[in-house]
Amino acid sequence: MVLLYTPPQKINKLQREMEVEILDLDYQGLGVAKIQGKTWFVENALPGEKVRIKIKEEKRQFGLATTKKILEASAQRQTPKCQYASRCGGCQNQHIPVEMQREAKQKALFRRLLKLQPEGIEFMPMIVGEAFGYRRRVRLSMLFDGKLKRLEIGFRQKNSAQIVHIEQCEVIEPALNKILSKLTALLSRFSQPKNLGHIELVAADNGVAMLLRYSGKLTENDRTLLLDFAVREELMLFLQDDEKTEQIYGQPPFYQLADNLQLQFDIRDFIQVNSLLNQRMITAALDWLDVQKQDHVLDLFCGMGNFTLPLSRRVKSAVGIEGISAMVEKAKANAERNQCQNVQFYRADLDQNFADEVWATEPFNKILLDPPRTGAAFALNALCRLKAEKILYVSCNPATLVRDAEILLNSDYRVKKVAMIDMFPHTGHLESITLFEKQS
């Protein structure tokens, strides 16, 4: 019998706990340290601080750790405004001044693009808004504690399934906090609170919409409690069981954009959660594309027309492409509602070959795309053949932005402008817009 030699596993010589100095801040709000030549990312640590860390995970090129004790605190460290910040899994970075958060995000974005294109990029001022009270949508988990006979409403604890019960959230709009503060008293009166799933609140421009998700069937008494609450608080009320979602009170929610545009949506639909920055982002996009009356513009991953309809007010024709059929129908309805007659919407899977689609052969001279976190690699490889003079890319993931930018650079496009958008202060999310121009 042949015995195979198995070398012993390499023993990690690093201590599980150690003292380190934090050298920098990454865009997700993690402190950066060097240990034995390797980069480590440390939770709850600021540049200039000395901290005792606990190793969480070590990988080949980097490691992850958490701060166990702050030995020397930075003068810039601040007390979180939110009383739940140390436990809630929502905002991770309230201990960091918002200006420092933004600078770290902007630096990371610019540095990544400079590696691809060292010259010729115009770095635009960051697009920012309010640091608190900016979210117009919130989703709340619910759990009934049978032993304590108590209903918990709030957010999942960080790295846990436990719920942090909250009465107020510092990053949501005031109109949502007004409703949030009354939910525990309302829902604790339900006959079967253990059947409650979650609640979504959305601050539309015509009032607050509320969705209650539950299993089983609501009793007439529980339904009456909800309806009375909706009438009293002037809510648009939606109920969702295991089979369907229905609106039982109020008008359909909508949000407004410039040029008297009004976009109607369902409470489950994706909309940008930061209303102010959504408008500023649209304004910047149209300005950078330098849209003119003779332009033919293609908008990919268009949703219900968030960019397409504002574009249609300024160009000869606009075409929006979306992968979800229901969103395409809502986009068409919004176009009709706003009397936008020079816009068309189509359903297409942009991760599949769309060369034979009727819209794919039109002579678009400008393109806008707002893809999901996975990016738009397949679509861009096909779109480069259209040879549009300008392409504006809205990104929510710097890694896929860089990957997709390389596709465009290899097709004779160059990065013209870029700006960081601080859509989600106190989180590690990095949004941006980048303008690419075709080289003549």
Swiss-Prot record:
Domain TRAM residue range list: 8-69
Protein keywords: 4Fe-4S, Iron, Iron-sulfur, Metal-binding, Methyltransferase, rRNA processing, S-adenosyl-L-methionine, Transferase
Species this chain originates from: Mannheimia succiniciproducens (strain KCTC 0769BP / MBEL55E)
Keyword Metal-binding: yes
Gene behind the chain: rlmD
Chain sites annotated for binding S-adenosyl-L-methionine: Q272, F301, N306, E322, D349, D370
Residues at which [4Fe-4S] cluster binds: C82, C88, C91, C169
The keyword S-adenosyl-L-methionine belongs to this UniProt entry's keyword annotation: yes
Similarity field: Belongs to the class I-like SAM-binding methyltransferase superfamily. RNA M5U methyltransferase family. RlmD subfamily.
EC category: transferase
Listed PROSITE patterns: SAM_MT_RNA_M5U, TRAM, TRMA_1, TRMA_2
GO molecular function, one term: 4 iron, 4 sulfur cluster binding
InterPro entries: 23S_rRNA_MeTrfase_RlmD, MeTrfase_TrmA_AS, MeTrfase_TrmA_CS, NA-bd_OB-fold, SAM-dependent_MTases_sf, TRAM_dom, U5_MeTrfase_fam
Catalytic activity: uridine(1939) in 23S rRNA + S-adenosyl-L-methionine = 5-methyluridine(1939) in 23S rRNA + S-adenosyl-L-homocysteine + H(+)
Function (record text): Catalyzes the formation of 5-methyl-uridine at position 1939 (m5U1939) in 23S rRNA.
Pfam family, one: tRNA_U5-meth_tr
PANTHER family the record matches: 23S RRNA (URACIL(1939)-C(5))-METHYLTRANSFERASE RLMD (PTHR11061:SF49), RNA M5U METHYLTRANSFERASE (PTHR11061)
Swiss-Prot/TrEMBL GO biological process terms: rRNA base methylation
Protein name in UniProt: 23S rRNA (uracil(1939)-C(5))-methyltransferase RlmD
Active-site feature positions: C396 (nucleophile)
